[in-house]
Amino acid sequence: MDPKGLLSLTFVLFLSLAFGASYGTGGRMMNCPKILRQLGSKVLLPLTYERINKSMNKSIHIVVTMAKSLENSVENKIVSLDPSEAGPPRYLGDRYKFYLENLTLGIRESRKEDEGWYLMTLEKNVSVQRFCLQLRLYEQVSTPEIKVLNKTQENGTCTLILGCTVEKGDHVAYSWSEKAGTHPLNPANSSHLLSLTLGPQHADNIYICTVSNPISNNSQTFSPWPGCRTDPSETKPWAVYAGLLGGVIMILIMVVILQLRRRGKTNHYQTTVEKKSLTIYAQVQKPGPLQKKLDSFPAQDPCTTIYVAATEPVPESVQETNSITVYASVTLPES
């Protein structure tokens, strides 16, 4: 191919690409300015620029529409009004307010479904001007939270994996940095995870997790070394076992002492009963007038002897009964 022809073809392709980048289907403009706002807040969309604002007085009709994409052939009408006519705008949807003085569209309590392309058309007698912009809504990011997801200790070093998370926010980007450092830490693919290997020389290190999206940012600091300190319960389990063993021994000693005390009380009661046993000797003699008659019976003892062993009452705890023996000598009456 002729070099001049090749150059001409290249120029034509360049113009085609430039035209396609500026216009979509039906000649719609593609390079719409992008407006970023916070989700849920009131949004004001300036649907104009200086040149359109100057020619607004010559317009006979204004239409504001919204589309989910520039390639979509269907648009939702939001505002339709004639500047020369008095009265409120027509077809004004809920939560919308149009300010004619500066051609600004207000959206109350913005929602995700409000995202899209907003187009304003100014119709004149013989011409039409169009202006568009793209609205993107983002949820504000909350304060991040840093947690230790994994910890290992070996040879005096501590290896940690930190995780940084947020409860609220979309399209969130994460970055890590050290408070005393001059250069940010760069985990793989700006991950919310950070791996650290620390030693005693890093005891004062403080790390910062920063979260951000196109409309907001927030950060949180974290000192990991306190979580790496040696836990006595982990490194000295023998102390726990020694304490348990000592407790068991003390319980056994107390049980033995109680048993010995009970046996001592029982022996004391038995000894006391034996010591306090009394023997009573009683002698009974018949009246005097019979003394003469009894002389004829020298072999018989005129006296009666009674032996009685008396004991004190036995405590209730002692169930053994003591027997009482009575020895009596009885003489026969005189016939």
UniProtKB/Swiss-Prot annotation:
**Which PANTHER family does UniProt cross-reference here?**
SIGNALING LYMPHOCYTIC ACTIVATION MOLECULE
Outcome of swapping Y327F: Disrupts interaction with SH2D1A
> What does the comment on domains in this protein's record state?
The ITSMs (immunoreceptor tyrosine-based switch motifs) with the consensus sequence T-X-Y-X-X-[VI] present in SLAM family receptors have overlapping specificity for activating and inhibitory SH2 domain-containing binding partners. Especially they mediate the interaction with the SH2 domain of SH2D1A and SH2D1B. For SLAMF1 a 'two-out-of-three-pronged' mechanism is proposed involving threonine (position -2), phosphorylated tyrosine (position 0) and valine/isoleucine (position +3).
Q: Which UniProt keywords apply?
A: Adaptive immunity, Cell adhesion, Cell membrane, Disulfide bond, Glycoprotein, Host cell receptor for virus entry, Host-virus interaction, Immunity, Immunoglobulin domain, Innate immunity, Membrane, Phagocytosis, Phosphoprotein, Receptor, Repeat, Secreted, Signal, Transmembrane, Transmembrane helix
Residues crossing the lipid bilayer are 238-258
* Glycosylation-annotated residues: N53, N57, N102, N125, N150, N155, N189, N217
Its domain of life reads: Eukaryota
The UniProt-reported impact of T325A is: Disrupts interaction with SH2D1A
> Which parts of the chain does the record assign to the membrane side Extracellular?
21-237
Q: How is it modified after translation?
A: Phosphorylated on tyrosine residues by FYN.
Instruction: List the Pfam families hit by this protein, alphabetically.
Output: SLAM
> Hey, what tissues is this thing expressed in?
Constitutively expressed on peripheral blood memory T-cells, T-cell clones, immature thymocytes and a proportion of B-cells, and is rapidly induced on naive T-cells after activation. Activated B-cells express isoform 1, isoform 3 and a cytoplasmic isoform. Isoform 4 is expressed in B-cells, primary T-cells, dendritic cells and macrophages. Isoform 4 is expressed in tumors of the central nervous system.
> What results from changing Y327F?
Disrupts interaction with INPP5D/SHIP-1 and PTPN11/SHP-2, no effect on interaction with SH2D1A
Changing Y281F: what effect?
Answer: Disrupts interaction with SH2D1A
Q: What is this protein called?
A: Signaling lymphocytic activation molecule
- Per the UniProt entry, what species is this protein from, by scientific name? Homo sapiens
Motif range (ITSM 2): 325-330
Disulfide bridges in this chain: C158-C228, C164-C209
Q: Which residues form the signal peptide?
A: 1-20
Q: Ig-like V-type domain: from which residue to which, for each copy? A: 29-138
Task: Quote the subcellular location field of this record.
Answer: Cell membrane
Membrane topology of the entry: Single-pass type I membrane protein
Broad class of the protein's primary localization: membrane
Q: Name one GO molecular function term.
A: virus receptor activity
Q: Does the keyword RNA-binding apply?
A: no
- The Ig-like C2-type domain extends over 144-223
Q: Which residues carry this modification: Phosphotyrosine?
A: Y281, Y307, Y327
